[in-house]
A protein has these predicted regions:
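Bacterial N-terminal signal peptides that target proteins for export
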Residues: 1-11
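Bacterial N-terminal signal peptides
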Residues: 10-19
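Boundary at the C-terminal end of the N-terminal hydrophobic targeting segment
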Residues: 23-29, 47-49
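Conserved serine DD-peptidase/penicillin-binding transpeptidase domain
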Residues: 28-33, 54-93, 140-436, 525, ...
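A short, well-structured edge-of-sheet supersecondary motif
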Residues: 93-117, 348-349
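Small-residue-rich helix-loop
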Residues: 100, 114-116, 395-398, 402-560
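Short active-site loop at a secondary-structure junction
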Residues: 116-136
Length: 560
């Protein structure tokens, strides 16, 4: 299990760690003179000699020896000249990151700056944004906060028949029917809801089962998300009632020949109201999966476009479902039928305050009953916020992250619109003493390319979180090098080093970031290193950038 130092107070080991030892460096300068040949945790003893024989390349070694020309660590304006800072200078000259933006800030809690380069430059954080969202939510709402989903009805019950509608009153729970192990299995959840009907004496519903997502107002997704992302499961938006994280699974396979239509069929959840336009074609062997899905929340229609290579095996794609509340009502409707309870009026959701039964019609029905006017017969609760935050950070779950941000707005300012949520987030920053005047936040997950954070802001937030009463729970939500979802990080380092590096990745096209905490081998809280490393506009694969960032984190770990 990952060792979480006693410096982090109540934090407990929660992540399974992969074992590993020190591995020799792969000195590849002769065949790749533009690359950096790196080994872990050492000094710059041989860099100058290597530069003489291989111009443009630098070898960082951990031989244990010391160059007679090595400059001892000195303090200049709070910054220590050290292996990490020197290496950061070398990295900036390397061809891999040439022309890209590269920024870093790493400080000890006690005040020393270990490494710094362009720390105030605003950059795209990608999923490093989730560190901010989860931390703010845990600090403001508390680690044991839970969402509630309730059942209520309009009308009257007579002789076992509900003369009215049954409402599933959403409370923002993002885990309903989720596959995550922390979530309540959907059939168990439905059995609890059915038990509430039985206890209330309802054996038949004369009206409809209505999925009510009004707890979250405002658009279901952020307008600054890329258009091609909107239909994929990374951009599942939602209101106050969801189902299966608002994911639609679709089985896809190549056609019989190149140019033939791709075969696509919905798998789960069942959404018989949906119509699909299949305008994707079978591509040549080796061209891969280039499918895109374009749905809309206004009608029950989605279009699948792009290509799918003929040599690919069938697979299940995950797309976004724009009708989460309606889907939840429909799934519960079907469950009740298996128990002999029928809803005569079918299913519906609530849009613009009105009951909607036909998803293709722009003419909605009567106004939905006010929640306060319903007779509530029971409710269920979500897992704790700290459990949801753990999955948010480990899985880098965008849907959970967006829900957490909008929950801050709903709980603190009675509105879940993004504008209200930003105000709430700034309130949290103020309570933590974090200056957010130099950043721009446009969502909770990092999917938006309109988010602009700097390493100095991320570091200041992470440092401030160490003073939060909820920090012991927060640190447990952050992954560990070598642990779950980070098995390949710092792979050449010892288990001791990997166990001390708590990190969150951030990745999208051209973006690779890591931020987090590094525990000291020995020492006090003041020796904890807080770091943020950000690269933007890189024209290479993440697999080419990761070894450089891994080495920076390894050098940082060697500093304490």
């Amino acid at each position: 299990m990952g060792r979480i130092n006693s410096l982090f107070a109540s934090a407990a080991a929660v992540l399974a760690m992969a074992s590993g030892g020190l591995a020799p460096a792969q000195a590849n300068q002769r065949t790749n003179p533009g690359n950096l040949a790196l080994t872990s945790g050492g000094n710059l003893a041989s860099a100058q000699a290597n530069q003489r024989t291989h111009p443009g390349s630098y070898a960082l070694t951990s031989s244990g020896g010391h160059s007679t020309e090595q400059t001892p660590a000195v303090r200049e304006g709070g910054r220590r000249q050290n292996r990490t800072q020197e290496y950061v200078g070398l990295v900036s000259q390397n061809d891999i990151l040439k022309g890209s933006q590269f920024s870093i800030l790493a400080v000890k809690v006690g005040g020393d700056t270990i490494a710094s380069r362009n720390p105030d430059t605003r950059m795209l954080p990608a999923s490093n944004m989730k560190l901010i969202t989860t931390g703010a939510a845990i600090h403001a709402l508390g680690p044991d906060f839970r969402y509630s989903t309730r059942l209520g009805y309009s009308g009257q019950i007579k002789d076992g028949v509900l003369d009215g509608d049954l409402y599933i009153i959403g409370g923002g729970d993002p885990t309903i029917a989720s596959k995550d192990s922390m979530a309540v299995p959907r059939f168990f959840l439905f059995s609890q809801w059915a038990g509430m009907l039985e206890k209330a004496g309802i054996r038949e519903i004369g009206g409809r089962i209505i999925g009510d997502g009004r707890y979250f107002d405002g658009p279901i997704e952020k307008d600054s998300w890329a258009y091609h992302d909107i239909g994929c499961s990374d951009a599942c938006g939602g209101d106050g009632l969801c189902f299966y994280e608002n994911i639609q699974e679709v089985k896809v396979s190549a056609g019989s020949s190149v140019g033939a239509p791709v075969c696509a069929a919905p798998v789960f959840p069942t959404t018989p109201w949906m119509r699909y336009g299949i305008n994707a074609r079978t591509g040549k062997a080796g061209t891969g999966d280039n499918l895109y899905y374009f749905p809309t929340e206004y009608v029950a229609y989605g279009e699948i476009v792009g290509s799918y290579a003929i040599d690919l095996k069938p697979r299940t794609e995950t797309f976004s479902n724009k009708f989460g509340a309606y889907t939840c009502a429909y799934q519960f409707f079907n469950y009740l039928k298996t128990k002999g309870i029928e809803a005569k009026g079918g299913v519906a959701d609530v849009r613009m305050g009105r009951i909607r039964t036909d998803l293709d019609s722009q003419e909605y029905g009567s106004y939905a009953a006010k929640v306060d006017d319903l007779t509530v017969i029971g409710g269920t609760q979500s897992p704790t916020l700290k459990e949801i935050a753990l999955m948010t950070n480990l899985k880098s779950d965008n849907f959970y992250a967006e829900t957490l941000l909008r929950t801050l707005g709903r709980r603190m300012h009675h509105s879940a619109t993004y504008d209200s949520s930003y105000v709430a987030l700034n309130d949290v920053f103020k309570s933590l003493g974090v200056d957010a005047s130099g950043v721009q936040i446009r969502d909770g997950s990092g999917l938006s390319r309109h988010n602009y954070l700097s390493p100095s802001f991320i570091v200041s937030f992470l440092k401030a979180m160490m003073g939060s009463p909820a920090f012991g729970d927060y640190i447990q939500t952050i992954g560990v090098a070598g642990g779950a979802h980070y098995e390949s990080r710092l792979a050449s380092e010892s288990t001791d080093v990997r166990n001390r590096v708590h990190l969150k990745s951030g990745s999208m096209n051209g973006v690779r970031c890591y931020s987090g905490y590094i525990e000291p081998r020995d020492g006090t809280k003041e020796d904890v290193i807080v770091f943020s490393i950000m690269t933007n506009n890189a024209l290479v694969r993440a697999s080419q950038v990761d070894p450089i960032l891994d080495r920076i984190m390894a050098f940082l770990a060697s500093e304490n």
